[in-house]
Structure formats: C-alpha cells, structure tokens
Amino acid sequence: MNTALAQQIANEGGVEAWMIAQQHKSLLRFLTCGSVDDGKSTLIGRLLHDTRQIYEDQLSSLHNDSKRHGTQGEKLDLALLVDGLQAEREQGITIDVAYRYFSTEKRKFIIADTPGHEQYTRNMATGASTCELAILLIDARKGVLDQTRRHSFISTLLGIKHLVVAINKMDLMDYSEETFTRIREDYLTFAGQLPGNLDIRFVPLSALEGDNVASQSESMPWYSGPTLLEVLETVEIQRVVDAQPMRFPVQYVNRPNLDFRGYAGTLASGRVEVGQRVKVLPSGVESNVARIVTFDGDREEAFAGEAITLVLTDEIDISRGDLLLAADEALPAVQSASVDVVWMAEQPLSPGQSYDIKIAGKKTRARVDGIRYQVDINNLTQREVENLPLNGIGLVDLTFDEPLVLDRYQQNPVTGGLIFIDRLSNVTVGAGMVHEPVSQATAAPSEFSAFELELNALVRRHFPHWGARDLLGDK
C-alpha cells in the first residue's frame, strides 16, 4: 500500500469509512493530448508521483526501467509509468491509449494518455470520446503546432467543453513569461474559430521538474494562477445528460426464466421511475415501468449513467437496439443524417460506399451519399474534396437502410455517436457524430435504390473500363 493511500484511510478512520467516502467523491475523466514529444506521458507520471500514487515496487521497477529505457539521463523517466508497450518504450513514444486511475482527497480521476503522432489520431479520438476535460500540452520551444490544432478541434467536436492548455518544458525556456504570453495569445487566436462555448485555462509548467504540476513553482513568480492539479480538482463539470430527456437504449433482453422478461442497458440520459409511461421506438408501442432492477436490488428510480434492467407491465416486442423514452416525447425516426466523421482507415471514405454502423446498441447499414467538406485543421476552413483520407475530418451525408432514432451528438453522445465498420474485415474504420438528423419530410427522394447505388459504386471501382456513369454524380 502506498503512503498516500494509507494516509487517506487513516484520515477517514478505517477502510470501510474510506470506501464510503470514495463513493461520494466526484469523478473527472480527462485526457492528455498534443504533438509528439510534448511530454504527455511524463506529465501523467509526474501527477502520479507527486500525489504519491506509486507503490514501492513500482518505484523500484521505475528506477531499473529508467536505466534501461530512460531518456532523462540520471533522472527518473516518469513517462515509463504510462508507456507500457514494449514498442512505446523502445521508441520513446505513446502508441495506444493508456488509461490510469488516481484520486486525491477532493476528487477521483481517470486519465487517458493519447498518442501525439498524426498516424495515431484515431487513437486520440477514441480516448476523447468518454472524457469531460482535455489537457492540451504545448512544447514551450515549439509553440502551437498542427497536432495541437487537430486535437483541439477533435476534442470540441466530441463535446469536450473544458480545455486546459499546459505549456510544458518551461525550464528549457528559462521560465520566460514572454514565451508563455506569446503562446497563450497564439492559441487564443486559433481557439476563436473553435465551435461552442469553451472554458479555456492556461498553466505554464515543467512536467520533468514538477513546476506548477502539483505544487506551485518558485521559478515562475510571475504566475499567480492555480497549479494543474488545483485546476483538475476544482473545475466544475456540468453533467448535461442528467437534464436531458430520458433515453434508454436496449442492449440485452434478459429472459432467465418464463417468469421474468427484462430489458438491460445503461440509461444514456435523463431519469426513469417506477410507474412512468414509456414508449418504445421505432415501433411506437407504449407501456409502464413495473420494476427497475439493479445488481443490488430493485430501485424506485434511476439516473443517467446507471446500468439497469427495466421490467414493463406489458409483454411487447422489444429487441436489442430499440430505444425507450418518455411516452409524451416526440422523436421521429429518420433515414438520413449529416454526420461529422473522423476517418480512421487507410482506404479513404468515398461517396457511394456502404458500411455497417453501430449506434447505441443498434447495428445497421449506411450508404455515403456525399461529402460536403473536409476541415483544414490549420485554419479550420472548409474545402471540397472527393474523398476523406486517413485522419481526415469532414461532414458527410448518410442514408440508412432502415429508419433510426437519433439525437444530435452535442445533445446526447450515446444516441448521437456511431462507428463505421468495414463489412469485409469487420474492422472499425471511422467514428461519426450526428450533426443533424434529416426528417423524412425534408429528405430528398432517391431516384435509385440502395442496392442500385451500391452496385454502381462497385462496378465503377473494380471495372472502370466498362465506363459506367456515376449515378450519384448525375443526380
């Protein structure tokens, strides 16, 4: 047991009291991102080290690993606490998304350490999808780079409203206030183009030396703001899903015996209570909630984020992927939508292609009708493109094989977020955030069926010498 944990348990008056206190602490999920070698893994290692979250055997192992793989000379290479893959240690970079947990007396934290290399941008998007705050590291020697802009845009696209710009390696710039001010102004100029109402904070620090990470730096008397840890402990995260309308995607129909039929899943938003009138979509059939079953017994009500099983008063046809919501709410099913896409495959996304998609437990097929634009991450301008390349970000029009019940991603990430799956390899090739569902009344009628468009795209791709015309292009 490490000393910090032992001290916390002693302060609470025993293990049982400490465990109860842990349950009532708020949880903050955040990620670290930025360009390669900006010091993301070192920063997380410093946070764990300075909050005394490292066990003695880990510290001993870290000393040995620093001698073998370290990049800091005689000093401890704190990045090795996070870079666990052999390839990461040998190259001195982060490849996969690494998750770490730690807690202080004020809050619990889950950290996602994301890679900085451009070819691993897809990993960064994966890490950002569950986070509420992003720490954007900037090397004080280099300033704002393309990857900084890319990660900032992806973070805001995925609904993150709190950005902490950590200007790292200030020790290599002699802790210059002028350097900090210049980078701060450069980033604010860029951030003015980012969508949404953002909470942006700036902290000058040195992850290697520990300046302004968990304790105030004596080398930067000109900075009177909070340390990075103080920002993480005090930032107010508003859980918008609690105030949103009820959304309950069915993940599993639980039928252990003839006397029980329940619908299991995680309440995506809002609240549900026993006796509430609910509606099942897309069928539109209504019923009442008879029971709310959890792992520790029945409940009278449940809130967003809780895993529950709902039992209804009527035996109606409900399958995996169906959506339960309040009976008095109107949410029409749509067959088309404009979707913000982060493309993750080497084979580019092109109009006419079809993919399997998964959204809130529902799996179906979608066709790419067109690409409206790709975002240039250098200046956030929009440009017309024929296809969306690896790591490209753009707005795409999709048509689904069947009507779906969708929310805008910014309103509800669960019922507004989807993934693209290659139908041959079964590999996830893209992430999508619903920008705007298109109602049946406003959707343009299609002259050709989904099968005809898919066959046309297949022929043009593999048999170009046949000279088949582009049905989408001729519309």
UniProtKB/Swiss-Prot annotation:
Residues 34-41 are annotated as: G1. Disulfide bonds: none annotated. Keywords: ATP-binding, GTP-binding, Nucleotide-binding, Nucleotidyltransferase, Transferase. InterPro entries: CysN_GTP-bd, CysN_II, CysN_NoDQ_III, G_TR_CS, GTP-eEF1A_C, P-loop_NTPase, Small_GTP-bd, SO4_adenylTrfase_lsu. PROSITE patterns: G_TR_1, G_TR_2. Pathway: Sulfur metabolism; hydrogen sulfide biosynthesis; sulfite from sulfate: step 1/3. Residues 206-208 are annotated as: G5. GO terms for molecular function: ATP binding; GTP binding; GTPase activity; sulfate adenylyltransferase (ATP) activity. Residues 92-96 are annotated as: G2. Its EC number is 2.7.7.4. Residues 25-239 form the tr-type G domain. Gene3D superfamilies: P-loop containing nucleotide triphosphate hydrolases, Translation factors. GO terms for biological process: hydrogen sulfide biosynthetic process; sulfate assimilation. GTP binds at residues 34-41, 113-117, 168-171. It catalyses: sulfate + ATP + H(+) = adenosine 5'-phosphosulfate + diphosphate. It is an enzyme of class 2 (transferase). Belongs to the TRAFAC class translation factor GTPase superfamily. Classic translation factor GTPase family. CysN/NodQ subfamily. Heterodimer composed of CysD, the smaller subunit, and CysN. This is Sulfate adenylyltransferase subunit 1. The gene is cysN.
